[in-house]
Curated annotation (Swiss-Prot):
BACK domain segment(s): 174-276
Keyword Repeat: yes
Tissue: Found in germinal center B-cells.
One of the GO biological process terms: proteasome-mediated ubiquitin-dependent protein catabolic process
CDD domains the UniProt entry points to: BACK_KLHL6, BTB_POZ_KLHL6
Function: Involved in B-lymphocyte antigen receptor signaling and germinal center formation.
Source domain of life: Eukaryota
Start and end residues of each BTB domain: 72-139
Record-given protein name: Kelch-like protein 6
SUPFAM superfamilies, alphabetized: Kelch motif (SSF117281), POZ domain (SSF54695)
């Protein structure tokens, strides 16, 4: 059996009792509600009686009838056991039995029906669920219950078993669960298991079951940019081990799986001595074009660009947070973009902001009060006082800014947020008034469309996304006032709603989603606040020693970094603060070469093959 007897830590209990309809109220002879709660008065002459508790009474009554073998009209014979049931109940709960009893099949008229493909214990579990909405799922029975529920089309039970398996994933059982999901066409479970394998690739490589992965599944896993490996040689060796496991069957599949190994990124000596010298590689002429691409890349540097020359997210890279543009103490515009690497305690220089390196100073653009965000490791910037309609994206692999489609409505003092694979540009100021317009960018089609407008027109607010929703916090409804409102957008309904207000009214603030909370800092607050979307409540995280109006905040390496800003004397700040959620401690991380405010701050993974390290003395730590 898949789950029984396997090793590995469980992320949930070994036994879970699932109630798919919510908690059951206790059975009682007394009315569960006052009659007045169930009555809607209509015109004073008649009432509409809506008894929400009747469904529970019916369910309890049907279970009692089954236990008493009363009014049952069919017997299900499983192995040597017999189960007396009601056809109507089975048909209502299962599409399988609905088709059996509602169509002109022989079982429609038979008193006793032999059921195959399931054991008696599992059928007992499914029937208990049918009559009570409860089922006991354990690691010993989950596979059998899932297979039977899928056979008889108890779809909600299938979902419950899939959720149980998702929570129980570990390196020893994930390949088996993946095969189970594939066999029964459980696409959602399959995607989650594949994602788990991608994120835990190194730990799973030693599993014997890994060598039995179907070729298409292996191809999909190796193609992922998120494949967690420390070097590409691990991917190559995995492919060759998989082929050698059944060489007569799999040698012909080598070109198909090898195309997802990023051979150009292998060490040149390893490529020559290990890859090109491998006997199976030499026996397969179809892979020679892939070898030639790698040779050319090694000879010509980075001029050859393909999917195989793009580093994976976890190879040769470090997670860094960027400080983009901004203003200095004398209100001078900053064109530089700097990456700070907390782990290596160094500063890294990348391409300057676009349109800022013309020979004539008068031709250069000043990026003032723009917005920025990261999508798929590319940084998007938009708007600004002198660049109201401009939108650019920074490609970290080639260290260049690329212009994309203009905004429909120019703006500044706005925000950008990523949600559902799209970029949202929200609110802001158009030079005359605060606007409530929201635009959505589709990267695939390079086009903008309009989403539902904000409930409150604001600029200089904080915004971020969290679990399929977008949050706009605080901001200025005009030039003098600030608001404490929290506006929430649900893309599934294209509607905004108001949530719990922030503890203080604030503008010139920024927010970031981190773990299960949204953190907000800036303005005149002298504090870091956190909002819980699950509980719809706010709390104070920690006090700050100074105001940090128009500062930046970004998550990096499981910590939060607060950069720059302006204090209560309107002086720019050069320090970088670090909030450690584990230690619950705020510390000063480093000092920037110069103070900055109104800048952008985002996190990316940056390859060291595409950046120039600035001398260590440039940063005070």
């Amino acid at each position: 059996m898949l789950m029984a007897g396997q090793r590995g830590a469980w992320t949930m209990g070994d036994v879970v009792e699932k109630s798919l309809e919510g908690p059951l109220a206790p059975s009682t002879d007394e009315p569960s509600q006052k009659t007045g709660d169930l009555v809607e008065i209509l015109n004073g002459e008649k009432v509409k009686f809506d008894d929400a508790g009747l469904s529970l009474i019916l369910q309890n009554g049907l279970e009692t009838l089954r236990m008493e073998n009363a009014l049952t009209d069919v017997i299900l014979c499983v192995d040597i056991q017999e189960f007396s049931c009601h056809r109507v109940v089975l048909a209502a709960a299962s599409n399988y039995f609905r088709a059996m009893f509602c169509n002109d099949l022989k079982e429609k008229y038979e008193k006793r029906i032999i059921i195959k493909g399931v054991d008696a214990e599992t059928m007992h579990t499914l029937l208990d669920y049918t009559y009570t909405s409860k089922a006991l799922i354990t690691k010993q029975n989950v596979q059998r219950v899932l297979e039977a529920a899928n056979l008889f089309q108890f779809l909600r039970m299938v979902d419950a078993c899939a959720s149980f398996l998702t929570e129980a994933l570990n390196p020893e059982n994930c390949v088996g669960i993946l095969r189970l999901a594939d066999t029964h066409s459980l696409d959602s479970l399959k995607k989650q298991v594949q994602s788990y394998i991608i994120q835990n690739f190194v730990q799973i490589l030693n599993s014997e079951e890994f060598l039995d992965l179907p070729v298409d599944t292996l191809h999909h896993i190796l193609k992922s940019d998120d494949l967690y490996v420390t070097e590409e040689a691990q991917v190559f060796e995995t492919v060759m081990s998989w082929v050698r496991h059944k060489p007569s069957e799999r040698l012909c599949l080598l070109p198909y799986v090898l195309e997802n190994v990023r051979l150009p990124l292998l060490d040149p000596w390893y490529f020559v001595e290990t890859v090109e010298a491998d006997p199976l590689i030499r026996q397969c002429p179809e892979v020679f074009p892939l070898l030639q691409e790698a040779r050319m890349y090694h000879l010509s540097g980075n001029e050859i660009i393909s999917e195989r020359t793009k580093p994976r997210m976890h190879e040769f890279q470090s997670e860094v947070f960027m400080i983009i543009g901004g203003c200095t103490k004398d209100e001078r515009f900053v064109a530089e973009v700097t990456c700070l690497d907390p782990l290596r305690r160094s500063r890294l220089e990348v391409a300057k902001l676009p349109l800022t390196e013309h020979e004539l100073e008068s031709e250069n653009k000043k990026w003032v009060e723009f917005a920025c965000v990261t999508l798929k490791n590319e940084v998007y910037i938009s708007g600004g006082k002198e660049t109201q309609h401009d939108v650019w994206k920074y490609n970290s692999s080639i260290n260049k800014w690329i212009q994309i489609e203009y905004l429909n409505i120019g703006r500044w003092r706005h925000k950008m947020v990523v949600l559902g694979g799209k970029v949202y540009v929200i609110g802001g100021f158009d030079g005359l008034q605060r606007i409530n317009n929201v635009e959505t960018y589709d990267p695939f089609h390079n086009c903008w469309s309009e989403a539902a407008p904000l409930l409150v027109h604001v600029s200089s607010f904080a915004a971020t996304s969290h679990k399929k929703k977008l949050y706009v916090i605080g901001g200025g409804p005009n030039g003098k006032l600030a608001t404490d409102k929290t506006q929430c957008y649900d893309p599934s309904t294209n509607k905004w709603s108001l949530k719990a207000a922030m503890p203080v009214e604030a503008k010139c603030i920024n927010a970031v989603s981190f773990r299960d909370r949204i953190y907000v800092v800036g303005g005149a607050m002298r504090a870091l606040y956190a909002y819980s979307p699950l509980e719809d409540s706010w709390c104070l995280v920690t006090q700050l020693s100074h105001e940090r109006a128009s500062c930046g905040i970004a998550p990096c390496n499981n910590r939060l970094y607060i950069t720059g800003g302006r204090d209560e004397k309107n002086e720019v700040i050069a320090t970088v603060l670090c909030w450690d959620p584990e230690a619950q401690k705020l510390t000063e991380e480093c000092v920037l070469p110069r103070g900055v405010s109104h800048h952008g701050s985002v996190t990316i993974r940056k390859s060291y093959t595409h950046i120039r390290r600035i001398v260590p003395g440039a940063v005070s730590v």
